């Protein structure tokens, strides 16, 4: 009885951590897609984009 409870607990913990890992991965991929989309939009010459000063770039990167 004791080892069945332990097994159930370990399985629940394992699947919970797996779920958290996939959630984290999903959020990171979403952020990367947003970052790539913003960069691609800024680099297209046809669009009006906000001009970034080189001295303000490092401050934006830090935030």
Curated annotation (Swiss-Prot):
Taxonomically, the superkingdom here is Eukaryota
Membrane topology is: Single-pass membrane protein
Q: Which compartments is it annotated to reside in? A: Cell membrane
Q: Which BP terms in the Gene Ontology apply to this protein?
A: mesendoderm development
Q: Which InterPro entries match?
A: SMIM43 (IPR054149)
Tell me where the transmembrane regions lie. 9-29
The GO terms describing molecular function are: transmembrane transporter binding
Could you tell me which Pfam families the record lists for this protein? SMIM43 (PF21976)
Instruction: Provide the alphabetized UniProt keywords.
Output: Cell membrane, Membrane, Transmembrane, Transmembrane helix
Q: Which cysteines are joined by disulfide bonds?
A: none
Where is the region Important for interaction with SLC2A1 and SLC2A3?
A: 7-29, 51-57
Q: Which GO terms describe its cellular component?
A: plasma membrane
Give the quaternary structure.
Answer: Interacts with glucose transporters SLC2A1/GLUT1 and SLC2A3/GLUT3; the interactions may promote SLC2A1- and SLC2A3-mediated glucose transport to meet the energy needs of mesendoderm differentiation.
The record describes the protein's role as:
Required for mesendoderm differentiation. Interacts with glucose transporters and promotes glucose uptake. Probably augments the glucose uptake capacity of glucose transporter proteins to meet the energy needs of mesendoderm differentiation.
Q: What is this protein called?
A: Small integral membrane protein 43
Which gene holds the coding sequence for this protein? SMIM43
